[in-house]
Amino acid sequence: AFWQGKRVFLTGHTGFKGSWLSLWLASLGTEVKGYALNPPTSPSLFDEAEVGKVIDSQIGDIRDQDALYESMLKFNPDILIHMAAQPLVRYSYDAPIETYEVNVIGTAKVLEVARSCSTLKAIVNITTDKCYENDERSQGYKEDDPMGGHDPYSSSKGCAELVASAYRRSFLQEQGIGLASVRAGNVIGGGDWADDRLIPDILRSFEKSEPVVIRNPKATRPWQHVLEP
Protein backbone atom coordinates (compact mmCIF):
# COMPACT_ATOMS: atom_id res chain seq x y z
CA ALA A 1 0.00 0.00 0.00
CA PHE A 2 2.92 2.36 0.60
CA TRP A 3 3.86 2.59 -3.08
CA GLN A 4 0.30 3.02 -4.36
CA GLY A 5 0.07 6.45 -6.00
CA LYS A 6 3.65 7.47 -5.15
CA ARG A 7 5.64 9.35 -7.79
CA VAL A 8 9.12 7.85 -8.22
CA PHE A 9 11.91 9.30 -10.35
CA LEU A 10 14.22 6.42 -11.26
CA THR A 11 17.61 6.87 -12.90
CA GLY A 12 19.11 3.87 -14.68
CA HIS A 13 15.75 2.30 -15.51
CA THR A 14 16.98 0.73 -18.76
CA GLY A 15 19.52 -1.53 -17.03
CA PHE A 16 18.99 -5.05 -15.69
CA LYS A 17 18.13 -4.07 -12.12
CA GLY A 18 16.45 -0.83 -13.15
CA SER A 19 14.12 -2.63 -15.56
CA TRP A 20 13.05 -5.13 -12.91
CA LEU A 21 12.49 -2.33 -10.40
CA SER A 22 10.42 -0.40 -12.95
CA LEU A 23 8.16 -3.40 -13.53
CA TRP A 24 7.82 -4.08 -9.82
CA LEU A 25 6.99 -0.49 -8.92
CA ALA A 26 4.47 -0.24 -11.75
CA SER A 27 2.77 -3.42 -10.52
CA LEU A 28 2.43 -1.80 -7.07
CA GLY A 29 0.60 1.20 -8.49
CA THR A 30 3.54 3.59 -8.51
CA GLU A 31 3.85 6.33 -11.12
CA VAL A 32 7.41 5.94 -12.40
CA LYS A 33 9.48 8.36 -14.45
CA GLY A 34 12.63 6.73 -15.80
CA TYR A 35 15.72 8.65 -16.89
CA ALA A 36 18.66 6.73 -18.36
CA LEU A 37 20.82 6.01 -21.38
CA ASN A 38 19.67 3.50 -23.98
CA PRO A 39 19.67 -0.13 -22.81
CA PRO A 40 23.27 -1.28 -22.30
CA THR A 41 22.83 -4.67 -24.00
CA SER A 42 21.05 -6.17 -26.98
CA PRO A 43 18.87 -8.03 -26.25
CA SER A 44 17.87 -6.31 -23.01
CA LEU A 45 15.23 -6.86 -20.36
CA PHE A 46 14.03 -3.29 -20.96
CA ASP A 47 13.15 -4.12 -24.58
CA GLU A 48 12.04 -7.73 -24.11
CA ALA A 49 9.67 -6.86 -21.23
CA GLU A 50 8.52 -3.64 -22.95
CA VAL A 51 9.25 -1.61 -19.84
CA GLY A 52 8.74 1.61 -21.77
CA LYS A 53 5.05 0.77 -22.11
CA VAL A 54 4.39 0.62 -18.35
CA ILE A 55 6.40 3.64 -17.17
CA ASP A 56 7.23 7.11 -18.49
CA SER A 57 10.65 6.49 -20.04
CA GLN A 58 13.10 9.23 -21.01
CA ILE A 59 16.48 8.61 -22.61
CA GLY A 60 19.01 10.97 -21.06
CA ASP A 61 22.44 11.25 -19.46
CA ILE A 62 22.76 12.08 -15.75
CA ARG A 63 25.84 14.12 -16.66
CA ASP A 64 23.54 16.51 -18.55
CA GLN A 65 22.45 18.54 -15.54
CA ASP A 66 20.13 20.87 -17.46
CA ALA A 67 18.17 18.01 -19.04
CA LEU A 68 18.07 16.16 -15.72
CA TYR A 69 16.81 19.29 -13.95
CA GLU A 70 14.03 19.83 -16.47
CA SER A 71 12.95 16.18 -16.33
CA MET A 72 12.93 15.79 -12.55
CA LEU A 73 11.32 19.10 -11.64
CA LYS A 74 8.64 18.72 -14.29
CA PHE A 75 7.74 15.31 -12.84
CA ASN A 76 7.68 16.46 -9.19
CA PRO A 77 8.59 13.12 -7.56
CA ASP A 78 7.95 12.03 -4.00
CA ILE A 79 10.90 9.62 -4.08
CA LEU A 80 14.14 9.52 -6.07
CA ILE A 81 15.91 6.19 -6.69
CA HIS A 82 19.36 6.67 -8.20
CA MET A 83 20.60 3.56 -10.02
CA ALA A 84 22.30 5.03 -13.11
CA ALA A 85 25.98 4.06 -13.21
CA GLN A 86 28.90 2.71 -15.17
CA PRO A 87 28.65 -0.73 -13.51
CA LEU A 88 31.53 -2.81 -14.88
CA VAL A 89 34.88 -3.33 -13.14
CA ARG A 90 36.83 -4.45 -16.21
CA TYR A 91 35.45 -1.62 -18.37
CA SER A 92 36.55 0.87 -15.71
CA TYR A 93 40.18 -0.03 -16.46
CA ASP A 94 39.64 0.93 -20.10
CA ALA A 95 37.57 4.04 -19.32
CA PRO A 96 38.47 5.34 -15.86
CA ILE A 97 37.57 8.98 -16.60
CA GLU A 98 34.13 8.02 -17.91
CA THR A 99 33.63 5.82 -14.85
CA TYR A 100 34.39 8.67 -12.45
CA GLU A 101 32.35 11.15 -14.50
CA VAL A 102 29.25 8.95 -14.38
CA ASN A 103 29.53 7.43 -10.92
CA VAL A 104 30.88 10.41 -8.97
CA ILE A 105 30.07 13.63 -10.86
CA GLY A 106 26.83 12.09 -12.16
CA THR A 107 25.75 11.26 -8.62
CA ALA A 108 26.59 14.79 -7.48
CA LYS A 109 24.50 16.23 -10.30
CA VAL A 110 21.55 13.99 -9.45
CA LEU A 111 21.68 15.11 -5.82
CA GLU A 112 22.18 18.75 -6.78
CA VAL A 113 19.03 18.66 -8.91
CA ALA A 114 17.18 16.72 -6.21
CA ARG A 115 17.67 19.42 -3.59
CA SER A 116 15.83 21.84 -5.89
CA CYS A 117 12.77 19.57 -5.99
CA SER A 118 10.21 20.86 -3.49
CA THR A 119 8.03 17.72 -3.53
CA LEU A 120 10.86 15.28 -2.78
CA LYS A 121 10.74 13.42 0.53
CA ALA A 122 13.31 10.63 0.19
CA ILE A 123 16.29 9.49 -1.89
CA VAL A 124 17.61 5.94 -2.26
CA ASN A 125 21.17 5.87 -3.58
CA ILE A 126 22.11 2.48 -5.06
CA THR A 127 25.79 1.59 -4.87
CA THR A 128 27.72 -1.65 -4.27
CA ASP A 129 29.56 -3.62 -1.63
CA LYS A 130 32.70 -2.94 -3.69
CA CYS A 131 32.71 0.58 -2.23
CA TYR A 132 34.58 -0.73 0.84
CA GLU A 133 38.35 -0.88 1.22
CA ASN A 134 39.04 -4.55 0.45
CA ASP A 135 41.24 -6.01 3.18
CA GLU A 136 40.58 -9.61 2.10
CA ARG A 137 38.72 -10.42 5.33
CA SER A 138 36.68 -13.61 5.55
CA GLN A 139 33.74 -11.87 7.25
CA GLY A 140 31.25 -9.50 5.68
CA TYR A 141 31.74 -5.74 5.80
CA LYS A 142 29.88 -3.43 8.17
CA GLU A 143 28.18 -0.21 7.16
CA ASP A 144 30.74 1.93 8.98
CA ASP A 145 33.81 0.24 7.48
CA PRO A 146 36.13 2.55 5.48
CA MET A 147 35.37 3.34 1.87
CA GLY A 148 38.04 2.42 -0.66
CA GLY A 149 38.37 0.37 -3.80
CA HIS A 150 41.36 -1.00 -5.71
CA ASP A 151 40.01 -0.46 -9.23
CA PRO A 152 38.42 2.66 -10.80
CA TYR A 153 34.89 1.25 -10.58
CA SER A 154 35.10 0.29 -6.91
CA SER A 155 36.79 3.52 -5.86
CA SER A 156 34.25 5.55 -7.86
CA LYS A 157 31.49 3.95 -5.82
CA GLY A 158 33.33 4.73 -2.59
CA CYS A 159 33.57 8.32 -3.80
CA ALA A 160 29.85 8.33 -4.64
CA GLU A 161 29.10 7.27 -1.07
CA LEU A 162 31.13 10.21 0.26
CA VAL A 163 29.31 12.58 -2.10
CA ALA A 164 25.94 11.28 -0.89
CA SER A 165 26.99 11.61 2.76
CA ALA A 166 28.16 15.19 2.21
CA TYR A 167 24.94 16.18 0.44
CA ARG A 168 22.87 14.59 3.19
CA ARG A 169 24.65 16.47 5.96
CA SER A 170 25.16 19.75 4.09
CA PHE A 171 21.81 20.20 2.36
CA LEU A 172 19.22 17.44 2.50
CA GLN A 173 18.79 17.06 6.27
CA GLU A 174 17.80 20.68 6.75
CA GLN A 175 15.35 20.39 3.84
CA GLY A 176 13.69 17.35 5.42
CA ILE A 177 14.76 15.01 2.61
CA GLY A 178 15.89 11.56 3.76
CA LEU A 179 18.77 9.82 2.00
CA ALA A 180 19.85 6.19 2.36
CA SER A 181 22.41 4.14 0.45
CA VAL A 182 21.83 0.54 -0.59
CA ARG A 183 25.01 -1.48 -1.20
CA ALA A 184 24.21 -4.54 -3.28
CA GLY A 185 26.36 -7.61 -3.81
CA ASN A 186 26.33 -9.77 -6.93
CA VAL A 187 22.79 -9.79 -8.31
CA ILE A 188 21.43 -12.64 -10.42
CA GLY A 189 18.14 -13.17 -12.22
CA GLY A 190 16.43 -13.44 -15.58
CA GLY A 191 17.01 -10.82 -18.23
CA ASP A 192 20.71 -10.19 -17.57
CA TRP A 193 22.64 -10.20 -20.85
CA ALA A 194 25.63 -8.16 -19.63
CA ASP A 195 29.23 -9.25 -20.07
CA ASP A 196 31.39 -10.21 -17.10
CA ARG A 197 28.47 -11.67 -15.13
CA LEU A 198 29.08 -15.17 -13.77
CA ILE A 199 25.73 -16.83 -14.53
CA PRO A 200 25.22 -15.29 -18.01
CA ASP A 201 28.85 -16.08 -18.90
CA ILE A 202 28.36 -19.71 -17.85
CA LEU A 203 25.18 -20.04 -19.91
CA ARG A 204 26.83 -18.45 -22.95
CA SER A 205 29.71 -20.91 -22.65
CA PHE A 206 27.26 -23.84 -22.44
CA GLU A 207 25.43 -22.61 -25.55
CA LYS A 208 28.69 -22.49 -27.50
CA SER A 209 30.03 -25.76 -26.01
CA GLU A 210 33.05 -23.84 -24.76
CA PRO A 211 34.92 -24.20 -21.46
CA VAL A 212 33.63 -22.02 -18.64
CA VAL A 213 36.27 -19.46 -17.68
CA ILE A 214 36.12 -18.31 -14.05
CA ARG A 215 38.11 -15.07 -13.76
CA ASN A 216 38.56 -15.12 -9.98
CA PRO A 217 37.98 -18.70 -8.79
CA LYS A 218 39.20 -17.97 -5.24
CA ALA A 219 36.93 -14.97 -4.70
CA THR A 220 34.11 -15.12 -2.15
CA ARG A 221 31.13 -12.97 -3.08
CA PRO A 222 27.63 -12.38 -1.68
CA TRP A 223 24.76 -13.29 -3.99
CA GLN A 224 21.15 -12.14 -4.11
CA HIS A 225 18.29 -12.55 -6.55
CA VAL A 226 17.19 -9.39 -8.31
CA LEU A 227 13.69 -9.68 -6.79
CA GLU A 228 14.89 -10.58 -3.30
CA PRO A 229 13.43 -8.07 -0.80
Regions found by a protein language model. Name each.
Residues 92, 144-146, 174-191, 201-224:
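A conserved pocket-lining segment of Rossmann-fold NAD(P)-dependent short-chain dehydrogenase/reductase
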Residues 107, 195-199:
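Amphipathic alpha-helical segments in well-structured domains
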